[in-house]
Each structure stands twice: as structure tokens, then as C-alpha cells.
A protein has these predicted regions:
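Low-complexity repetitive segments in secreted/extracellular proteins
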Residues: 1-44
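Intrinsically disordered, low-complexity polar regions and short flexible loop motifs
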Residues: 44-291
Length: 291
């Protein structure tokens, strides 16, 4: 049923687009050209010149005494474009069915073969607890680049479990992950002279085998779960988990490479920790509770 709705939406969008074209610009197609036209379920879309910034603040408040909280604010987010691949390599949104199980909503990233689609991100962060406000500084991501992969969401297979079940596949490069505890400064520069203190992790590469996206969670064979739980003692918390893998091939393998880790400080001096590499990673099970 959902697939039929998506088809109807796509047809409606196509008809609306045709309605804006003058009749004089339409040309008949030969049989050979028509034979090459094929349809697909789902919706394809892309971005062009995307950028946003402003005083938006996201806050997670704990139910514990005093309601301590963690916040992110003053967001900046932008994306560069691969102009030649805007329509040939889009994001894809699809809904598909599984035998005897709930339907899945799947969002697939562009393949980004040329590596031109890159994200820039910055946000301030802090913690409020015990009547004290701590401003942690600014988190900066430079040249965040996705190559394929994507996110799938559905309902948990166990009807007694509430929340969102998900699958996640990633092949991602990050030019620089930077934490500046004193001031944001110029977020487009990795190491400006005016910044006296920062942590910089550069050249982060995460992928699966053969440089393909790493299936950290699979919506059917190794689903992740994100939900809110209240235990028998009345304590509430956010829960993030990934189940055991049910595939006969076991959990997929990934790899992580970091080109350099550097601490910069005008007080204690600079410390260069060099590079790091984990050749093979298998995520068998994950259970994280946020209090």
C-alpha cells in the first residue's frame, strides 16, 4: 500500500512538472527512446546551495534530581554540491515491504563518486548540572563526506518493545573534527593562529570491506533500537542498542583510520599523538543508556 502511495506521489509530481512546460517545448519520443524509460518505486531528491545557521538550541534534560541537561546551540550547517550529478546521483527515499514483518522506510545517500558533496558543521555545547552551567566550547566538523550508505527505520519486531528500529550503513570521511573550548573563531580554518587551545582529529576514514559502506546495523538481520525506557525503580533514560546479528555470515566488518590527533594549548604546549588505524571492527552487540 505504501509503495502505491509513493508511486502516486511521484506521478503527481511528474505531471505537475510537465504542466509548467509550454507545449511548444515538447517533442515526441521515438520508440527506441521510449523503450529505455523505466520506473522505480520511491522518491528521489537533492539539495543545491544548502546552508543554515542561527540560534537554534537542542536540549536533552535528564529526569534525575535537579534535571541536569546537555545542550547544543548556535548551529551552522552547509553543503557543497556536485552540480553535474544533481539529478543523476540524488538522495532516494523508498518504502519497501518485508514478508511477515513491518514495512521499512529507507533513505539512501548519494554515491558521491567524485567526493564533491561535503558538509560543514559547527555547534556550541554545554552542560547544566548542580546549579552550575558549563560551556564546553564549540564542536566543528569540516569536510564531512558520505559515500553511499544510508538510514532505514521501522517498528521493532517485538510488539512489546516501543521505539524506533533502524539500520545504518556508513562510508564517511571527515577532514577535521575539532573541539575548541575557548571560542568558536573561524570555523572554516583548521588551525588559525588566533586559536590558542583545541583538540583536532584530522583525516577520519570509516568504511566497510572493500571500501564499501559499513553496515553498523541492519534493519532485519541486526537491527538497532532507539527508545525511552522506565525501569522497575522508576528511573527513566534514553536507550540506544544494536541487537545480535542473525545472519549466517556474522556481523559485517569495518575499518577506521585517523591520520592525526593533536592537542594544542598555550598553557601546556602542543601534543601530537600521530595516526591510528583499526584494520577490522565487528560490532556484535551494543547497549547504551543515557541518564
Amino acid at each position: 500500500m505504501c509503495a502505491l502511495v509513493i508511486r502516486a506521489m511521484c506521478c503527481s509530481l511528474a505531471l505537475c512538472a510537465l504542466g509548467t512546460v509550454h507545449a511548444g517545448n515538447l517533442h515526441p519520443l521515438e520508440d527506441e527512446a521510449l523503450s529505455q524509460v523505466s520506473g522505480q518505486d520511491g522518491l528521489a531528491f537533492n539539495l543545491r546551495g544548502f546552508a543554515m545557521s542561527g540560534p537554534l538550541t537542542l536540549t536533552y534534560t535528564s529526569p534525575d534530581a535537579g534535571n541536569p541537561s546537555l545542550w547544543l546551540g548556535n548551529f551552522y550547517l552547509s553543503r557543497s554540491d556536485d552540480v553535474d550529478a544533481t539529478f543523476t546521483d540524488p538522495y532516494r527515499l523508498n518504502i519497501y515491504s518485508r514478508l511477515g514483518m513491518s514495512d521499512v522506510i529507507e533513505l539512501s545517500n548519494p554515491l558521491n563518486v567524485n567526493g564533491l558533496v561535503k558538509w560543514q558543521f559547527a555547534a556550541d555545547f554545554g552542560v547544566n548540572a548542580n546549579n552550575t552551567s558549563f560551556n564546553g566550547g564549540t564542536l566543528i566538523l569540516q569536510d564531512l563526506t558520505f559515500y553511499g550508505g544510508g538510514l532505514s527505520i521501522t517498528t521493532p519486531s517485538d510488539p512489546s518493545v516501543q521505539g524506533v528500529a533502524f539500520g545504518l550503513a556508513l562510508r564517511v570521511d571527515i577532514g577535521n573534527l575539532i573541539i575548541r573550548p575557548r571560542a568558536r573563531d573561524d570555523i572554516s580554518v583548521a588551525n588559525p593562529d588566533s586559536v590558542t587551545e583545541q583538540l583536532s582529529i584530522s583525516g577520519i576514514h570509516l568504511s566497510g570491506e572493500n571500501n564499501s559502506p559499513w553496515a553498523i546495523a541492519h534493519v532485519t538481520t541486526q537491527p538497532g533500537i532507539f527508545n525511552a525506557i522506565t525501569d522497575a525503580d522508576g528511573q527513566s533514560y534514553l536507550h540506544l542498542g544494536i541487537d545480535w546479528n542473525s545472519s549466517p555470515n556474522g556481523a559485517p566488518k569495518g575499518s577506521l583510520t585517523i591520520d592525526n590527533i593533536t592537542f594544542k594549548s598555550d598553557v601546556t604546549g602542543n601534543v601530537n599523538l600521530g595516526s591510528s588505524r583499526i584494520e577490522s571492527i565487528q560490532l556484535q552487540y551494543l547497549d547504551v543508556k543515557f541518564r
